[in-house]
Regions:
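Glycan-recognition and catalytic regions of carbohydrate-active enzymes
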Residues: 55-103, 138-146
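Carbohydrate-binding surface patches
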Residues: 86-128, 172
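Solvent-exposed beta-strand/loop surfaces of large extracellular or lumenal domains
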Residues: 132-158
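Conserved, mostly hydrophobic/aromatic
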Residues: 45, 104, 168
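C-terminal beta-strand-rich structural cap/linker in extracellular carbohydrate-active enzymes
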Residues: 152-178
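Glycan-recognition surfaces
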Residues: 1-57, 83, 96
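Active/binding-pocket-proximal capping segment
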Residues: 60-68, 72, 110-111, 120-138
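Short, glycine-/Ser/Thr-/acidic-enriched flexible segments
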Residues: 11, 50-52, 98, 109-111, ...
Length: 178
């Protein structure tokens, strides 16, 4: 895929899942099999030197998860694929070329899964604030695709971190040095 083949960032996922505006029946052949957390993670997973926000401005307005789209760079110093299996899942981290920030994107297919990652890519002896954008506990592309939880925790390169990905879900993290 080239940098312009796929544009992530859809927040209005549900409107694409129904037969029509008047018929609110979920049509499994007419939807985005994704979640907002996965849409954010795709900004890291898919390399694209030119990024854009693919949804309508009113769907981003006032949404706290839009901050990740504002923060994620397009120029990277380093890229590491931490884990994955073609067609199933992937976790990628990238270091911003203009700062000490790292960005993580982890996505899965229609199967939910848990992946454990070591944070050895972070600088030694430094503490990081991790701003995490994740699907809710019972989320997924069929259930709560537009819900996203945002939390902040402190982590170091000696830590490991467990990522829980519901069906069609994802997780995006920004690591900033304290």
């Amino acid at each position: 895929s080239s940098p312009m083949d796929y544009t992530p960032g859809i927040f209005n996922i549900k409107e694409y899942r129904h037969n029509s505006q008047s018929d609110r029946t979920i049509n499994k052949n007419h939807h985005i099999p994704s979640t907002i957390a996965k849409e954010l993670a795709l900004y890291v997973v898919i390399y694209a030197p030119v990024q854009m926000a693919a949804d309508l401005p009113e769907n981003y307005e006032g949404h706290p998860a839009f901050q990740f789209i504002l923060d994620v760079p397009t120029d990277w110093e380093k890229t590491i694929v931490l884990n994955g299996e073609i067609g199933k899942y992937i976790t990628t981290v990238r270091k911003d070329v203009n700062s000490d920030d790292w960005f993580l994107g982890s996505i899965t297919n229609e199967e939910g899964r848990t992946v454990d990652i070591n944070l050895t890519f972070l600088d030694e002896s430094k503490e990081y604030n991790a701003t995490i954008y994740k699907d809710p506990e019972n989320g997924g592309w069929l259930n709560q695709p537009e819900e996203v939880e945002i939390q902040n925790i402190s982590l170091t390169n000696k830590d490991s971190y467990r990522i829980t990905l519901p069906e069609g879900g994802g997780q995006a993290i920004r690591f900033t040095k304290k």
